[in-house]
Amino acid sequence: MGDRSVRRYRSAPDPRALFPWLLALVLALGFANAALVRALFDDGEVALAAPQTRAVPANAHPGTTAPTKPATAPKRPVAAPKEGLWTFRGNARRSLTGVGPVPRRLPRIVWRYPRTGGMCSASTDETGRSTWCGIGWTGQPNVIPRPRGKLELRFGAYDRRYHFLDAATGREVRSPLLTGDLAKGSATSDPDGFPLYYAGSRDNSLRVVALDRRRPTVLWKLDSYAGGPVTWNDDWDGAPLVVKGHLLVGGENSWFYVVKLNRGFDRHGKVRIRPRMVARVPSWDGRLLAARSDRAFSIESSVAYDRGIAYFANSAGLVQGWDVRQTFRRGNPPRRVFRFWMGDDTDASVVIDEKGFLYVASELEQFTGRSREVGQLVKLDPRRRGSPLVWSVQLRGIGRGGKGGSWATPAVVGDTVYIATNAGGVVAVDRRTGRTRWKLSLPGPTWGSPVVVDGVLVEGDCRGNLRAFDVTGRRPRALWSIRLGGCIESTPAVWRGRIYVGTRGGALYALAARP
């Protein structure tokens, strides 16, 4: 699940054993009812609504006060709404792999960050304390247009920091934001132009960061342990979504959150938020508890959203869709409207196409009967609740750790679905029929999500090579390969002629076509 090289394994409590504790807490908060019990221990049709109390900001910027009448739109937005690669895979449906053009000939390295050395720090996992470097899974930088034609890159790294760079030069445009542990996964810039950044860390905290101060300033934190038990782990890997003023995010603590941000500006013109927890939903249900011997239910995928429904998957392979329309409008608990069990760990994000079909990739870790039956890449129709499976593909090649399947998020481009595998390589599948069109072998594992722009596939391998292939024909044709060093677990960001990608070798690189 996610980057095992940096995971802190925990002995997960059995949620059934925690029932007395949960019930006592719920009673104290005034939320004990049959619907809540069903949400936690049956089929999850009703979600747990958190207390309607105002969240207390953590590390708020000193000297800022809230206005008596909050602003409803930013006066000086960082970017036009939805412009740039503001979150993992570019949009709420997790379906934008990049924006061209993309180099078709061997590119040059424009810059390296840092110029020397690497982004490294020590962290502890089940094997002990050791040093980790670079950018890992999923690790896709945000690419944000700024005034006067400038671009800013924003990304987290294994030096425990979030970095903010001029995309043209690789120089820092803001001070790095230091966290308490590895800055894993991908983060999100506010899509509506507010100078806010939403970023998780392995130090148990998801942060909302103001970018209109002298240095990045944490306005609020969501702690993995706040409000209830942690089931499995306490990291934040998935990139949050901001939709209609609400933050949607899942944690490795096995809970899905909806937070109303209440964004605005104070009397000094500085951005402020007044977060209020609207819902906290368990990623498991009674059927999953009955089917699994362990309690590994963490959410490492980035929540996807389409037409009022939020979709996510967990490390037990349960894919769910929750209707949040009334949650947004009235603060009502979300209502589960879709359920499909993959049978094995599903860390890849759900991808939604323009017609509302879902594409989901999972791993082969436990080799359950269900995962053998379903396969590791599926197309689902959430409107067919009784039989949503449209087609499935087996990805049974075995790679690192004796495991198969995929950690990568699918790319759905044109009439083809592209998926990278733990065994090493990329598989192309007909989007309509599920028929395999071709397979491409690469040194594995290939955890980075495929990027396909203008008929060019860009994928990194675990020998430190970033490669490009022409995929407009019946078979992929190699265009170029450039060695960067260090396993490439992260997903490249392709934006208008440049490629930005980090490696486990310690650095982030900017590539562009040669003059």
Sequence positions of predicted segments:
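C-terminal region of N-terminal signal peptides and the immediate post-cleavage residues
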Residues: G30-R54
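Extracytoplasmic/lumenal domain signature
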Residues: V56-E83, F88, S95-W137, N142-D237, ...
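N-terminal export and membrane-targeting signals
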Residues: D3-L25
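Phosphate/oxyanion-binding loops and surfaces in catalytic or ligand/nucleic-acid-binding neighborhoods
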Residues: D43, F88-N91
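Intrinsically disordered, low-complexity serine/threonine-rich segments
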Residues: S5, A49, T53, T65-T68
